[in-house]
Amino acid sequence: MDLAYLWFWIVGVLFVGYFVLDGFDFGVGMSLPFLGKDEVGKRQIINTIGPVWDFNETWLIVAGACLFAAYPEWYASLFSGFYLALLLILLALILRGVSFEYRPQREGLRWKKGFDTMIVIGSVLPALLWGVAVANLVQGVPLDENHEYTGSLLTLLNPYGLLGGITLVLVLFLHGLYFIGLKTDAQVHQDAKRLATRVGFITVVVAAAFLIWTIFIAAAHEAPLLPLVIAAAALAAVALLLSMFFHTKEREGWAFT
């Protein structure tokens, strides 16, 4: 294995680590409009990720640095072509971080609701745009002979890209609900379990559509790694179904894992 392949796997592992570890943070943020009927409940929800949310974002910084160091041309094409989408992600993450830090310091109900809204936006928007970006990388994006992106943000918002974004939002939302169910008790715990059951069924349907479409895209492109794509899709489907199975058995730790 030469260095190009080695760094490819390193960058891949770092991005996967980011989506897994910061992903459930996004899911917890998405849950605020649906869980926690009072300030005590919402505070309980936010406290589940209080010690870890900022550390988990370190994975993204390290992944971006490794991508720049190992594949500068790829980095340049990605960050110039997806500039607006990545800028929106960055702004959303800033809003989310500010809201986490300043929400406990403001006592007014209007301030609390405003910070809660920013947390939700800062959780949904990055998940949606990351899903759109990854789906477009799988599908392929228009590049010229200089490897410069020739499309726009609207080019990325194609049906397959949007389905990828919605799929990631639902998966991370479900992951966050499992985490809330694992870390809370009383009313918040029960509400999170009920909501996770409903969201789980929707996620299975949407994720199945996305995975099937992904296989068809790989087949249409005559991808040499088509068997690997099929195996990865099957593994993702099995993992999602197993998480729902463990959730129904009230084994929240296994469902979250």
Residue ranges and their predicted role:
Residues V52-S123, D144, A220-P227:
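Membrane-interface helix-loop-helix modules in multi-pass inner-membrane proteins
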Residues Y102-F256:
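Long, contiguous internal "core" modules enriched in hydrophobic/ aromatic residues
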Residues L21-D22, F26-S31, L90-R103, L170-I180:
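Membrane-water interface of transmembrane alpha-helices
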Residues F8-W9, F15, V62-W74, V206-I217:
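Membrane-embedded alpha-helical segments in integral membrane proteins
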Residues W7-Y18, F79-L93, V120-I121, T155-V171:
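Alpha-helical transmembrane segments
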Residues D22-G23, F55-L67, A127-A133, V169:
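The first (N-terminal) embedded transmembrane alpha-helix
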Residues M1-F55, I61-G64:
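N-terminal signal-anchor module of multipass membrane proteins
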Residues N47-A69, K193-A207:
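Transmembrane alpha-helical insertion/packing segments
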